């Protein structure tokens, strides 16, 4: 299993930096942060130092800002060379039709910021040694690094929710990044207290898998 050394969140351009500052207090314990102004000279030596020891790279930016996008691509190109998983959090509401050099781009706005951060937080936990059942970083990369789209959802539930209700709500609230999906992995990340037993959890997992395509390889943390 690959050792996870570091996760870094970089705010690029005015809007990217503003979003980073907005969420920084929620993630600072687990993620290193960096702010890059569009006037910054982003040369190879700077990017190498930026990526040193990093396994997962998150970038916040507005894809309508062409200068910010150039910086994103410069960092993403070298991240790919170093086999760093790069995920862009694009603040623009418009579809980004420009060439992008990162592994995965997700639209982020005021409505989905908290849920997106929760998913990122759970991904980071899922590949850590402290996780009860961890996922290999290679599986995360394989699931996210593709030219095709992904579908993802997040929900918070308690024992008042039936197993079927949980599976249905997750399916109904799912967001697609494009119509054509990778069809590779079904990743189920669960955070729960000890009041829930393994049998109940197994029912939930089976219900979620029943809602998905049979061709998906399911992995769980």
Where are these regions (language model features)?
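Tubulin/FtsZ superfamily GTPase core signature
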Residues: 1-221
């Amino acid at each position: 299993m690959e050792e996870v050394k570091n996760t870094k969140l970089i705010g690029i351009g005015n809007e990217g930096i503003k979003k980073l500052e907005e969420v920084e207090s929620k993630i600072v314990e687990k993620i290193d942060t960096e702010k890059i102004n569009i006037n910054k000279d982003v040369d190879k030596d700077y990017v190498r130092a930026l990526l040193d020891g990093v396994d997962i790279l998150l970038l916040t930016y507005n894809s309508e800002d062409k200068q910010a996008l150039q910086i994103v691509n410069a960092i993403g190109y070298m991240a790919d060379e170093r086999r760093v998983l790069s995920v862009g959090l694009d603040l623009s509401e418009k579809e980004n039709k420009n060439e992008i050099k990162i592994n995965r781009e997700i639209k982020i706005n005021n409505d989905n910021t908290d849920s997106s951060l929760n998913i990122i937080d759970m991904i980071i936990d899922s590949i850590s040694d402290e996780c009860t059942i961890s996922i290999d970083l290679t599986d995360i990369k394989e699931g996210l690094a593709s030219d095709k789209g992904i579908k993802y959802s997040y929900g918070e539930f308690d024992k008042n929710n039936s197993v079927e209700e949980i599976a249905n709500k997750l399916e109904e609230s799912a967001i697609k990044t494009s119509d054509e999906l990778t069809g590779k992995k079904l990743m189920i990340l669960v955070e729960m207290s000890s009041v829930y037993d393994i049998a109940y959890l197994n029912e939930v997992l089976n219900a979620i898998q029943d809602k998905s395509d049979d061709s998906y390889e399911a992995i769980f943390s």
